[in-house]
């Protein structure tokens, strides 16, 4: 985005902050695909056999200047005999550039927000998936109740357009947004069918992600406003920067109607000890107070979704649990607060007495059953967790097979190094390693035992069987006790921006 900042500022000064003319700019499409348009080919779309080049974009912009061809119908698959591309292909390019244009005002606001709060240098660490777990360790041991919240979706698309009107003042651009909605989804339905949403998300993943993030951003902004109104203590907003599109920083600027509608209701109670965390479509709300206040927040969420977003949500979709008795699933971990009882004997002169001290500790558990199901679905093992070969990879070279298994194993190891008990993690590594050996044995048409004897001389899998302890030994001396504590304790990686698809976050 930085390399196109000059062009954006120039276009904004010429067009008085209108977004509609940006659709006719070539650099927007270069920005959409992350390449420079000076190259001959800047995108290769998996869904099509053709490649989109600078010449194609120029032809597309020329076609859009003609009013009769401004809208490219996505369902029209007739090929143009002169250009050789169907209209669906051009529609895909337009939708990618269209999303970039929509993201521009939010990106500029987000950048200025980062500069004002002076957290730019910590931006990469906050984007890490593991950045939220240190907060859990610091805060959750002092809290009592937790509520699982699954954000309802889909929302009617006209509601999204009305919300966008507060942020985008360009009327022609909003009309074009409605046209995209009309042709990609079932516009006449009050509730968008799940099949249409699925097709829409596959054909336009960036567009779908933008709409979902904007909907969540609006919902969380209202929640932040309610949270600030419910207590005299000001809430320091925690910016969630772990999503792919980071235009939705938490802001306190909301429409005045919210203050008018909710001020009377929220004056009945105060709840200063509350924390809210979200990743993708699931969020959790943790509080120190009694379940009565948690039930009040539950009621607010239900009414907010039904009245403001016209999304039906039932109360049983939000579960309230006690942290000391129940665990909850979040970001691929089972988490609960474990109570450790310690007895201390004290003696004063001739009198002695015993004191019981209860220590709370956050327990992070690897969901071994869920991971085995994911590995079985990906054909690394059966449903019982017994490793099997990967026939699809048998045609690859030995180096590519080992490299793929090694990447998955390291990714699992990094992500679940924050576990309190490493035994489940070792089992996952065992499944992947033995599956790799069986895949190589299948390729070379040999038994596992004969292939392992051959590997002893060639040392082909020496890197694959290297444990994290060897990596830590490069930093700390082996005689140091720090090495053993690091290897057995929890380790959070603040540079972990993504994980593999085998880890289920929902």
Curated annotation (Swiss-Prot):
HAMAP family with a match to the protein in the record: MatK (MF_01390)
Pfam families: Intron_maturas2, MatK_N
Species per Swiss-Prot/TrEMBL record: Austrosteenisia blackii
Source organism phylogeny: Eukaryota, Viridiplantae, Streptophyta, Embryophyta, Tracheophyta
Function: Usually encoded in the trnK tRNA gene intron. Probably assists in splicing its own and other chloroplast group II introns.
GO cellular component terms given for this protein: chloroplast
Alphabetical UniProt keywords: Chloroplast, mRNA processing, Plastid, RNA-binding, tRNA processing
Record field: transmembrane: none
One of the GO BP terms on file: RNA splicing
The keyword Ion transport is annotated on this UniProt entry: no
Protein name: Maturase K
Keyword Chloroplast: yes
